[in-house]
Amino acid sequence: HAEMLVLQEAAKTYGGTRLVDCDLYVTLEPCAMCAAAISMARIRRLYFGASDPKSGGVESGPRFFSQPTCHHRPDVYGGIDELRSRTMLQEFFEVRR
């Protein structure tokens, strides 16, 4: 849930929790919890590399931004350099195990 950490740091840096002029770049599709935090922070655009059919919450699973309870929907660009993102994630977790 690196998105949560980044949003917290950005809020400290910019002096507020509304990050309306900010874009977020991540390697993996955010989960539903992180998608909710992205929405609450009013992130302008979300870019992610690899889709996550198992735990994703943007284009997979609950599709948080498509729910009627979602009050802010960032522009979403998924699948950016997906193969490279997937490879980076696999290599990262191989080292961790």
Language model features by range: what are they?
Residues 1-9:
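Acidic helix/loop or adjacent segment enriched in Glu/Asp that either coordinates divalent metal
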